[in-house]
UniProtKB/Swiss-Prot annotation:
This is tRNA (guanine-N(7)-)-methyltransferase. S-adenosyl-L-methionine binds at residues 104, 127-128, 162-163, 182, 260-262. It is an enzyme of class 2 (transferase). It catalyses: guanosine(46) in tRNA + S-adenosyl-L-methionine = N(7)-methylguanosine(46) in tRNA + S-adenosyl-L-homocysteine. It comes from Colletotrichum orbiculare (strain 104-T / ATCC 96160 / CBS 514.97 / LARS 414 / MAFF 240422) (Cucumber anthracnose fungus). Coiled coil: none annotated. Residues 1-22 are annotated as: Disordered. It holds the Pfam family Methyltransf_4.
Amino acid sequence: MGRARPKSQKRGDYRVSRSQENAAELPKKKFYRQRAHANPFSDHHLVYPACPDEMDWTLYYPAFPTQGETLPNHIFTHNQSCMRISDSTRSGSLQKNIEVVDIGCGFGGLLVALAPLMPETLALGLEIRTSVTEYVQEKIRALRAQNEGTGLYQNIGCIRANSMKFLPNFLRKSQLSKIFICFPDPHFKARKHKARIVSATLNSEYAFALRPGGIVYTITDVEPLHQWMAEHFVAHPSFERLSQEEEEADECVQVMKSETEEGRKVTRNQGQKFVALFRRIEDPPW
């Protein structure tokens, strides 16, 4: 009786078979499992542009090239080309800018839910884990194939990136209207707080990328982390917290609560969800 194949081989065989079969079949999450969090300070051999103008976004949003020509509906996964930098013969720019970013997008539940709600807005998921990024890319590719001819899900994309290090390499000043930070790693130990995705330094980068009037959405099931994020955003001169009435009137809040994988897990476990929204205010005159 032969030995059972190791899980890594099963995952590899599954991904190879996906490239040879119907692209409209949704990927199975069990073949893309990875540890819950990654160390943002490690060298992950990431590929990133020197500046936003060098990024070729047409690989991730093929329906929105500058020239008005629809490119083949394809997403380059990490087994092929993690990221393409524009060369002199191809601008790599889009008809419109990315306006919504989900930092640490996980398995892409929020991206997929937002796509039909804001079909004319480009949204991007940033995820540091390789297998999870590949899953989201495959899921987007399958959803586009299932909805061919409708334009659905053409407005979302996902790349592997370390948001704590390279956010300004991808995004221009005042480019974004929304930033989502959903169920981030709480890093409970005090010596690990420097790895939290919300800090005075990182909030300045969010303020750089977010236009005046833009919103940062935060949600967590860890109350001390919720308090930490609120304190750091309120203390930053570029942000003000929205009132509870404003939060309840924002349709994205309910989506954020119910459509992320972590949000569903908290609901199943009957846990609490702590939400806070922060508005980017105008810079003072210099």
